[in-house]
Amino acid sequence: MKPDAHQVKQFLLNLQDTICQQLTAVDGAEFVEDSWQREAGGGGRSRVLRNGGVFEQAGVNFSHVHGEAMPASATAHRPELAGRSFEAMGVSLVVHPHNPYVPTSHANVRFFIAEKPGAEPVWWFGGGFDLTPFYGFEEDAIHWHRTARDLCLPFGEDVYPRYKKWCDEYFYLKHRNEQRGIGGLFFDDLNTPDFDHCFAFMQAVGKGYTDAYLPIVERRKAMEYGEHERNFQLYRRGRYVEFNLVWDRGTLFGLQTGGRTESILMSMPPLVRWEYDYQPEAGSPEAALSEFIKVRDWV
């Protein structure tokens, strides 16, 4: 079947609705929607939940942008895209909880297509989800990765190991020599064997995110914590900011190509702190995190 951008867009709009409903059901607070238009073509729906019962901030963004020509920064790496009109669409979300025992989570699914008359379209899917705990719980990490593995299995035995490895490699802070979190799945440039297969996989990843995340939220959201744990959470959120502003390709691409800054930076935590040469106390749960987030096989 030839690529159907309209079908993908409808799935993404429904996915945004569903995830917002699921997060509201856990939290009690409602999302505020900000619809926006892009002068050069397209627009989106940014939805933010702030200061809820469970989530300090949750942002779920849908965007669909299109244009007559790709920016030079994109065609430099992909000369085959020169002279083509394009559509790029996706849902991207980040959830920052109040409770330090509840991990931060991120998910993204996206579709890109570039066309010109008389030529086959160039298209691909990308996406994934990853988890950033502040305090490590093995049962949470196992559940997260088991859910990821199980949704991949119908698409092949090698899919989960390949996309887990890619996730571990992508969410890595070179300047800190550490992982951002415990990973999950990351894929890009997916266009084989055919559109239907790739679209089905993207749908499985999009739907699988809440299956992976919400049971962990329910398990941890009522755990008691104090100022000590909160301070550590805010310190570790600094790593999230560092990754997004220094290494994340999506953030950099969006900012360099005139994307909507408010939506791009919606992933930022509302509060964060840095501390010069911070060293956690030896043997403490905070010190244990550096070992916990090292790459390993969780399932």
From Swiss-Prot:
Catalytic activity: coproporphyrinogen III + O2 + 2 H(+) = protoporphyrinogen IX + 2 CO2 + 2 H2O
Site (Important for dimerization): H175
InterPro entries: Coprogen_oxidase_aer, Coprogen_oxidase_aer_sf, Coprogen_oxidase_CS
Chain segments carrying region Important for dimerization: 240-275
Molecular-function annotations in GO: coproporphyrinogen oxidase activity; manganese ion binding; protein homodimerization activity
Cell location: Cytoplasm
Class of this enzyme: oxidoreductase
Gene Ontology terms describing biological process: protoporphyrinogen IX biosynthetic process
Primary location class: cytoplasm
Ligand binding (substrate): S92, N108, V109, R110, G258, G259, R260
Cofactor: Mn(2+)
Residues the record marks as active site: H106
Family to which the UniProt record says this protein belongs: Belongs to the aerobic coproporphyrinogen-III oxidase family.
Protein name (database record): Oxygen-dependent coproporphyrinogen-III oxidase
Native organism taxonomy: Bacteria, Pseudomonadati, Pseudomonadota, Gammaproteobacteria, Enterobacterales
